Amino acid sequence: RNPDISRMIVVAIDNDGPNRMNEYSAWKYQESNIPGVQFGGKGVEYAEFVMDVVKPFIDKEYRTLSDRQHTAMIGSSLGGNITQFMGLDYKDQIGCLGVFSSANWLHQDAFDRYMDRQKLDSDQRVYIYVGTEEADDTDKTLMAGNIKQAYIDSSLSYYHDLIARGVDLENIKIHIQSGAEHNEEAWAENLPDCLRFFAEKWD
């Protein structure tokens, strides 16, 4: 369907269903409108699983280009959150990040403080995507306010922070899509553009 995109090996990792909110969040979230509801805090364990178990296995079993430049991570919604976190924690191993519809507003302050302590690499490639009609029923239980704007603001904050901390502008691409909702259809539509952006710097 997209013959112009470079050949690559894609590894898709199943999430843990309802527990994905734990494994994709590096920090605990305790501000739900539902009394007693909290989640998150297992993102570090998930990141270690990906980088210490999954990646070495794939590199051993398949003919990969295992260097940083040819290693990418892409995630949507909460998967975007853990992609942002791992992009900081494993910046020496992950050269490309695809952050789709990140729900980072769930722990924006914690992420910003963590990012402030990191030294970013100017050559890390980061593709950011967000729609103007983001939000789902779960979001409404977690935040009282304009959720659609929260998605946009969080993505813009990440974009500005990357620039402010020295990532070259040519290595960042942001796409805000008018009318796009929080779903797989929108993410699939924009995935080819993300992959092309990554491959521009591949040898």
Residue locations for each model-derived region?
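Non-catalytic cap/lid and distal C-terminal segments of serine-dependent acyl enzymes
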Residues: R1-D203
